[in-house]
């Protein structure tokens, strides 16, 4: 690695939150908490059975607020990295939980939305939401009050804040991917974009992802083990540069 790094972009996926007890989508059988993805994570599913979809996310929201669900060592290490690095750390997450915020990160882009927010289905106005969203809960910001929905990007919808993400990738000198499958685009293409702009690239995963060949450096194991080790290395080199200055 070419230390020190000043502009770090970290992409995180379900693997980083799984160790905190957040249930992940099982791609091998297309189920999420025993529901078909097309039933609970598509606009068509919401139109077909809004009660089912609202209940599904209401249950996920309750689970996220369970006192037993806490940031793990990987989240805490990334929070420390942002706080102590002499530069910029941007977290781009595919996760809809708030574990990065609770782990200490502030510069976070939720490209797939946030579970603890709801959104007007017409105006797209977003509000904080810690309780249940029910069919019939309306947003009154529109001339015709409209149904509230989870602030979550469903399959077939455009991810959020893509312009900001690509701007961060253009200036990144280090790109780290943690706990991602490498099969969901556009996120799976971020490593290529970062490399095109000269960034060093690192994959941290339980096993090689579908795009592992794109990465210069690979570290396989639990995120809660590998991420703190990497952060220690990054900050140690930062300190050694300060001492030698």
Swiss-Prot record:
One of its GO terms (molecular function) is histone deacetylase activity, NAD-dependent. Its cofactor is Zn(2+). NCBIfam families: PRK00481.1-5. Binds 1 zinc ion per subunit. Substrate binds at residues 57, 60. Keywords: Cytoplasm, Metal-binding, NAD, Transferase, Zinc. This is NAD-dependent protein deacylase. NAD-dependent lysine deacetylase and desuccinylase that specifically removes acetyl and succinyl groups on target proteins. Modulates the activities of several proteins which are inactive in their acylated form. Its main location: cytoplasm. 2 residues (Tyr-57 and Arg-60) present in a large hydrophobic pocket are probably involved in substrate specificity. They are important for desuccinylation activity, but dispensable for deacetylation activity. It catalyses: N(6)-acetyl-L-lysyl-[protein] + NAD(+) + H2O = 2''-O-acetyl-ADP-D-ribose + nicotinamide + L-lysyl-[protein]; N(6)-succinyl-L-lysyl-[protein] + NAD(+) + H2O = 2''-O-succinyl-ADP-D-ribose + nicotinamide + L-lysyl-[protein]. Residues 1-237 form the Deacetylase sirtuin-type domain. It comes from Vibrio vulnificus (strain CMCP6). It is an enzyme of class 2 (transferase). HAMAP family: Sirtuin_ClassIII. The lineage of its organism: Bacteria, Pseudomonadati, Pseudomonadota, Gammaproteobacteria, Vibrionales. NAD(+) binds at residues 13-32, 94-97, 179-181, 205-207, 223.
């Amino acid at each position: 690695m070419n230390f020190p790094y000043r502009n770090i972009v970290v992409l995180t996926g379900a693997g980083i939150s799984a160790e905190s007890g957040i249930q992940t989508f099982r791609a091998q059988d297309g189920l999420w908490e025993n529901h078909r993805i097309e039933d609970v994570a598509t606009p068509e599913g919401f139109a077909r059975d809004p009660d089912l979809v609202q209940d599904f996310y209401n249950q996920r929201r309750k689970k996220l607020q369970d006192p037993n669900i806490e940031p793990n060592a990987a989240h805490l290490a990334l929070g420390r990295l942002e706080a102590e690095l002499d530069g910029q750390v941007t977290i781009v997450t595919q996760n809809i939980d708030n574990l990065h915020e609770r782990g200490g990160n502030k510069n976070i882009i939720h490209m797939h939305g946030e579970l603890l927010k709801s959104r007007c289905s017409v105006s797209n106005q977003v509000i904080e939401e810690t309780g249940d969203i029910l069919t019939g809960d309306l947003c009154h910001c529109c001339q015709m009050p409209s149904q509230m929905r989870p602030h979550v990007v469903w399959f077939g919808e455009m991810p959020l804040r893509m312009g900001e993400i690509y701007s961060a990738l253009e200036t990144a000198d280090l790109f780290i991917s943690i706990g991602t499958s490498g099969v969901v685009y556009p996120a799976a293409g971020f490593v290529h974009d970062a490399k095109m702009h000269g960034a060093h690239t690192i994959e941290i995963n339980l096993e090689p992802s579908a795009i592992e060949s794109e990465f210069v450096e690979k570290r396989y194991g639990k995120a809660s083990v590998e991420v703190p080790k990497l952060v220690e290395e990054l900050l140690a080199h930062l300190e050694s540069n300060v001492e030698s200055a």
